[in-house]
Amino acid sequence: MLHLRLFDSSLYYTLASASESSGLASSTSTERSFNGTQGAGGVAAGGESLTPTDVAAVNLTYFTPAISHVMLAPTTIATTTASATMVQIQTTAAPSHDLETGGNSTSSDPGEFDNLNSFYFYETEQFAVLWILFTVIVLGNSAVLFVMFINKNRKSRMNYFIKQLALADLCVGLLNVLTDIIWRITISWRAGNLACKAIRFSQVCVTYSSTYVLVAMSIDRYDAITHPMNFSKSWKRARHLVAGAWLISALFSLPILVLYEEKLIQGHPQCWIELGSPIAWQVYMSLVSATLFAIPALIISACYAIIVKTIWAKGSIFVPTERAGFGAAPARRASSRGIIPRAKVKTVKMTLTIVFVFIICWSPYIIFDLLQVFGQIPHSQTNIAIATFIQSLAPLNSAANPLIYCLFSSQVFRTLSRFPPFKWFTCCCKSYRNNSQQNRCHTVGRRLHNSCDSMRTLTTSLTVSRRSTNKTNARVVICERPTKVVTVPAMSERV
């Protein structure tokens, strides 16, 4: 299955449950029949016991790792007991394939999982999606960093946060998705125990950093809206927020250095983690969900609630006012009571969109994993397909952020449009852009023409008024507005 997941507890949780129930399984089903083929390869069936060679072949067939994230493990795995009969208990690492609640027993029906195919989206589709994600994440975030480097003279706190978030997302693509692709090709872990700990630590750290840099960005937007005139220590505070985000990410990643180690799993060396019991996995996943999603989401929600309240309390950013001498048509000007620049509001909208995408991408994954470790996900082929889709949403967050930058930042779009392949794409949209520009110019020109006509009428009226004041007993009417008539008496000679 495609599960680009950071904290995949399903395999380890399933193996722990299977090890506890292996004694019961060996006493009740010493020989299992397999009809046809299962998953990606066939398993010899009938009443025959499996030889070590057959077991190795089965393990190689079912051991398709999905390792792009922190708790990464084989998608489907066939575990064997140490008994002489080589009883095979097939377990699945997908969230949709949990054992019974509590994890202390397998299904009473030995053929329940025979028709379930954990390779719902098989290797070709998985590799295709992985390569697409990797390409979009790396190219998109590299393009954003390139734009920030080209326009480094235009410094702003928002650009600083965007650069840090793009750097974290780029690391997600290079360390998580690329590692997943490589491990799917090699099957076994071949880098050693030290590299196992270092790479796992790096994967967790960049995942946390992508989240907590977003939290820091939200806090900065909160400060920019609630204290719009506070410029004295804004840059220093922004740097402290980013440094704190990376420091918190590193601290939350430290347990990985202890939990992960290189182990021999089914005859293949793997970078592995074992917690021992389903309860331990429930506690672990609860902590991960809180630190990776729940706490950041609460902080971000609180910041934006205060931002919305502040903007609402200060009134509209642009208030309507009547144009002097041109009827009641509303004009827009900055409010003198609460000055919040238009650019600052635009950055708030962009950050809010990034936060919304973050919640959309992560909440299904977190909820699904929690339901899995607590035994609330039933076994079915449909759930495998659902899990495959949900698990692909996490890295989509890193792929979507660059698109949001281009959508909200004209600077990013203009800079990228000067370089291929973005230049080729903008050329395709040239005709549409020209038509839109002509329509805008026509509208603006018509408004300017009407405005000039009105000014010309007022100037003519004032000229007539000034000339008429030299005549005795003359009365001049200035037609400034059709609804109002102003009468000016002529100056009389002194007697």
UniProtKB/Swiss-Prot annotation:
Keyword set includes Glycoprotein: yes
Keywords: Cell membrane, G-protein coupled receptor, Glycoprotein, Membrane, Receptor, Transducer, Transmembrane, Transmembrane helix
Gene3D superfamilies reported for this sequence: Rhodopsin 7-helix transmembrane proteins (1.20.1070.10)
Gene Ontology MF terms: neuropeptide receptor activity; vasopressin receptor activity
Matches recorded under InterPro entries: GPCR_Rhodpsn, GPCR_Rhodpsn_7TM, Neuropeptide-GPCR, Vasoprsn_rcpt
Known tissue expression: In adults, expressed abundantly in the head and very weakly in the body.
Segments on the Extracellular side according to the record's topology features: 1-54, 151-164, 261-287, 375-383
GO terms for cellular component: membrane; plasma membrane
Disordered: annotated segments: 24-45
Regions crossing the membrane: 55-75, 130-150, 165-185, 240-260, 288-308, 354-374, 384-404
Superkingdom of origin organism: Eukaryota
Compartments it resides in: Cell membrane
Stored PROSITE patterns: G_PROTEIN_RECEP_F1_1 (PS00237), G_PROTEIN_RECEP_F1_2 (PS50262)
Glycosylation sites per record: 35
Membrane topology of the entry: Multi-pass membrane protein
GO BP field: ecdysis, chitin-based cuticle; G protein-coupled receptor signaling pathway; neuropeptide signaling pathway
Residue ranges with Low complexity bias: 24-33
Topological region Cytoplasmic: 76-129, 186-239, 309-353, 405-495
Family, as annotated: Belongs to the G-protein coupled receptor 1 family. Vasopressin/oxytocin receptor subfamily.
Function description: Binds to the cardioactive peptide (CCAP), which is a neuropeptide.
PANTHER family associated with the record: CARDIOACCELERATORY PEPTIDE RECEPTOR-RELATED
Protein name according to UniProt: Cardioacceleratory peptide receptor
Lineage per the UniProt record: Eukaryota, Metazoa, Ecdysozoa, Arthropoda, Hexapoda
Gene: CCAP-R
